[in-house]
From Swiss-Prot:
Its main location: membrane. The chain crosses the membrane at residues 31-53, 62-84, 104-126, 147-161, 166-185, 198-220, 225-244, 264-282, 286-308. It comes from Archaeoglobus fulgidus (strain ATCC 49558 / DSM 4304 / JCM 9628 / NBRC 100126 / VC-16). Keywords: Cell membrane, Membrane, Transmembrane, Transmembrane helix. It is a multi-pass membrane protein. This is Uncharacterized protein AF_0692. Coiled coil: none annotated. It is found in: Cell membrane. GO terms for cellular component: plasma membrane.
Amino acid sequence: MKALYWLLIGFLSSTLAEVLSSSHPAGVFDAWGIGVIFPLYSLHALVLGGWLFRLGVNWQRLFLFGCVFGMYEAYITKVLWNPYWGPDAFQFLGIYWFQFAVLVFFWHPIFAFILPLLIAEYIYTSSNTLLNAAKQFPLMQKAGKKFALLLAALAGLNQSVNTPPSMFWVALLSFFTILTPSFLLEKRKIEDIMPSGRVLKLLTFALIILYLFWTFALRFDKMGSFSGQLVVWLFYLLLFYLIINIKSCKPESKTSEKKGERRFFAACFLVYLTAFLITSSFKAFPAAMLFLLAGTAYGTIVFASILIKFLMR
């Protein structure tokens, strides 16, 4: 039964990260999606989520593991060293820092890791462990719901810029066709559906093998320079050092009827859908770019606040 939960978490991660950005609008519904994207996102979400619960959940680790997720854009896709989108003016020490900030501090932490796990916790469990951790993010305690509604609206706007309406409706229908029956699954604690023990170690090994394979199989001629690879390794070391040594209050793991959360999730979806429908009829590229820049700025500030507080402890 655990495997079914894992497949659904992988589906959520793949869809939210790749379809919302229109990087791969077909999601997991073609050969590239099912053969490459789905294993890549599933293993990352499960392995990093499993280690998050093994080390102890707090909001800092939740975000930092999301940053680790985003670092696959170095050795697997080589985008941090040789991007095929975005400006190329912010290159230093072999790293394209605009793409680095967008992918490592914003897109992957939020859409590939945190949101999929939050949705999975909401749908498949009776606990609020991750939600309570997410509420501790900067600005979330006082304006969490407003921030989430704004994020939903801007995500819909971003989708309208990058995805034709016909493709959007196909993706949305496919998403709910898979997700709706899963509401009937038995509700457990989030800790119980994440990989642990020997299985977690095996999945970690599988993820390492995946990294080794795609390092050589995908755009190997675009590998970073010595300085670019050194920066990546140093940032990996910094992330893992912070993850292991960071200390903060852990959120309570408690069950809930989730009636309020259910209404709020529905409201977020309606805001997202409305934003898409309104903005798909006109050019909204400047606003979509503002969404990307604002989200990246927020993620960068979150990372900086974690680092500064850790150094000043």
